[in-house]
A protein has these predicted regions:
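Amphipathic alpha-helical interaction surfaces in cytosolic regulatory modules
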Residues: 22-94
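Short acidic-hydrophobic, aromatic-tinged amphipathic segments that line or gate anion-handling sites
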Residues: 96-100
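STAS-typified acidic loop motif
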Residues: 2-29, 51
């Protein structure tokens, strides 16, 4: 997995490529822990995410909770396959998710 973070003021976009699973989740967890406390908006760009496991879903929830009370958290450029995982788990009811 590769993560490219882009910061514009207090807004951060993380472009995540590859698989987000048990082996790669610690890398994203480290990125989330390093977020500036002044970050008001977080976007996960999943344009190149091929797969997400329960470990990845756990980090999505962690990011959602971390951004609670701020401008927000959303996920963009989600493939149909990854969107199906969010839909089956009900995450699409809580989190702003935009398909490709």
């Amino acid at each position: 997995m590769e993560i490219v973070s882009k910061t514009e003021g207090s807004k951060v976009t993380m472009e995540i490529t590859g698989w987000l699973d048990t082996q790669t989740a610690p890398q994203l967890e480290k990125e989330l822990s390093a977020l500036d406390p002044g970050t008001t908006s977080l976007v996960f760009d999943f344009a190149n995410l091929e797969y997400i496991s329960s470990a990845g879903l756990r980090l999505v929830i962690a990011a959602y909770k971390k951004m609670a009370g701020k401008e927000g958290f959303r996920i963009v450029n989600v493939s149909d396959e990854v969107y199906d995982v969010f839909s089956l788990t009900g995450f699409d009811q809580k989190i702003k998710i935009e398909k490709k």
